[in-house]
């Protein structure tokens, strides 16, 4: 769900095209963006051929993909992908160039949260995440004058003293909220969709006199685990419809399909 939701929120044309016109396989698309030359060497002419002709690069890109989607910097991606920081930065540059909508959303989100001290999670509901000590961070940012940095380089850099710790915490906080400005929006909107679906489902259960007959056992990320008697055979289709309609309230550019699976146990 998060990838489709991200495509809508970022209004990233490459992601939207892949979901609407392509295979919908983001691993293929990421591999094509990052390892295009390697994929072409194996006979791929487009992203849709990666899974069949270059599965090793589809597998290899996953560590880069997940870290990038969460807004990770080059050192983190290097650690995840087991490559040099320089190579990780090349991956980031390739993805920023390929996913222009996502990159622009991240840039604007970073500027907004640094200026205003909060992130708009979902414009449809007004949910926000606040940078709790943003006023302190902003004042400290103003104090970092050219004179401060000159003194820092001469007397503090590399000493591990209190000033070094203040500088470290300052930039660490900025990096955290830069990542949140992209990640919290998709994750948060996904959570709102799930809550909307669960509310609708609960009301349907009550309205149809299934209270204490159908049970909502667990919600994990974008999955709902329910217990119901086999006599209510159409319940899986009803649940799919409820979840898809909940997603459609918040994801306007493309559908987010739901798929029910029935069994005697559940494994996430």
Cite the ranges covered by each PLM segment.
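Conserved catalytic core of nucleotide polymerization and phosphodiester-bond processing enzymes
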Residues: 1-268
């Amino acid at each position: 769900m998060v990838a489709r939701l991200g495509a809508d929120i970022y209004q990233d044309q490459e992601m939207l095209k892949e979901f609407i016109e392509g295979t919908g396989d983001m691993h293929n698309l990421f591999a094509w963006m990052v390892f295009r030359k390697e994929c072409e060497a194996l006979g791929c002419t487009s992203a849709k051929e990666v899974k069949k002709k270059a599965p090793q690069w589809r597998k290899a890109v996953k560590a880069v993909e997940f870290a990038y989607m969460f807004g990770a910097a080059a050192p983190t991606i290097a650690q995840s992908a087991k490559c040099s920081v320089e190579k990780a930065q090349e991956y980031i540059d390739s993805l920023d160039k390929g996913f222009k909508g996502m990159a622009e959303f991240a840039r604007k989100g970073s500027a907004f949260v640094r200026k205003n001290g909060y992130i708009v999670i979902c414009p449809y509901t007004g949910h926000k995440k606040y940078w709790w000590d943003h006023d302190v961070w902003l004042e400290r940012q103003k104090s970092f004058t050219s004179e401060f940095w000159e003194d820092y380089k001469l007397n503090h850099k590399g000493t591990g003293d209190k000033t070094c710790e203040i500088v470290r915490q300052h930039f660490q906080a900025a990096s955290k909220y830069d990542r949140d400005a992209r990640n919290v929006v998709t994750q948060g909107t996904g959570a709102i969709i799930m809550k909307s679906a669960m509310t609708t489902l609960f009301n349907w259960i009550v309205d149809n006199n299934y209270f204490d007959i159908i049970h909502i056992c667990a919600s994990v990320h974008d999955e709902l685990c329910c217990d119901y008697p086999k006599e209510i055979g159409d319940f899986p289709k009803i649940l799919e419809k409820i979840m898809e309609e909940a997603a459609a309230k918040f994801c306007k550019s493309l559908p987010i399909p739901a798929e029910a699976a029935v069994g005697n146990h559940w494994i996430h």
